[in-house]
Amino acid sequence: MELLKRKENTNLTEKVLQFGEGNFLRGFADWMIDRLNKEYNWNGGVVVVQPLASGLCDKLNEQDGLYDLYLRGLKNGNRVEETRVVECITRAINPYEDTDGFFACAENPDLRFIISNTTEAGIEYIQGQKYGDFHNSTFPGRLTMFLKKRFDAGLGGFILLPCELIDKNGDKLKECILKYAAEWLLGDDFEHWICEENYFTNTLVDRIVTGYPRDTAAEMEQSFGWRDNLIDTAEIFHLWVIEGDKALAEEIPFHKIGLDVLWTDDVTPYKMRKVRILNGAHTMSVLAATLAGLETVADMMADQVVSGIMHRGIYDEIIPTLDLPESKLLQFASDVAERFKNPFIKHYLLSIALNSVSKFKVRVLPSILEYIKRFGKEPANLMFSLAALIMFYRTDEAQDSPEVVEFMRSASPAEILSREDLWGEDISFLLGSVEKYIAAAEKLGVKQAMADLAKEQK
């Protein structure tokens, strides 16, 4: 079979510079842009820049920027599978080998958007780096150099859409760039241009992208009729929340083709929704599920007792503590349940259980505390999950820092709950319920204790 390549030259206008050529952006942002081109005639090409010295640029260029994307999951309870060739990437640049080619993009007046996914550690400022030393600079440092080229060319700024999974990713990126501009003495006019001509948006991205399907790639290539070294796979669900001027949405109108891209004045409530409902549901349920002898998220969702405690935790205890419109919370919770039931993804509970103490502090404990604050009583299902956390850390399955594992294994519940450094505050006032649920689980077994808890709430 021949390698996947273009049959004819592309006539796309290069409008997007993308830092990151990995699975996530190709299965998320590039898929959206490809759909916008084909369904709305946006005609936008993506120039991909490789953030690290080693990467996929050569493979992308060998395939003329093309790759197959296979989406699969549940939609309204039905199994859905979709395959498409994504054609929006015009070329890929390895800036370590072609630095001039990278900086030449700054002089393209059609270029309007910068998308990035350089990992959570990518957006950082390190003092003492030298202007012009591309190879030894951070991503924000390189971007500062790129923006200076743009400024010197007398061109307008960009709409920046960072996808790194950190709070206020756009604000942090802008802050780093301004620090480099000041340290490198690039001038007040340039700093003013950064602030006035460029739009740094804060974003929240949500899609599970599972990447290259090693086990089934050969079989998939047979069905395609060509070889593809860059097959990407992802779930059906997608969400991109962008905090920025809603007028900018008209320049990249994903909403016109029904994509779940939301422009808002504040991304925080949506981030809280994701952390509390999606991540919180994982963390509140996987430890009890593991103690009950289950292995995967699919097993957990198929078990009525375990999935029941998660369902009641989400709908009766987490959602009432959140302030978005109820319809948006209920729809997201419904989507989460479908995502957890995805028959195409084998998600092991123990992989989710990694570092559960710190996860519980961020994902579940705030819901417990807010529930108590609003309703004057403890949320039973979330309290059971806290008891399950303590019991889980007494097993050999717990994976965390050696200090946390050793302490959690040997300490009493009272000692654990009083550790302010673990929880951000002393939560000893929760001890009564925790000890009650631990005693029930030790006497009856975790599964029966959960079943009894369900009966109490009927």
Protein language model features and the residues they cover:
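Substrate/ligand-engaging "lid" and interaction regions
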Residues: M1-K458
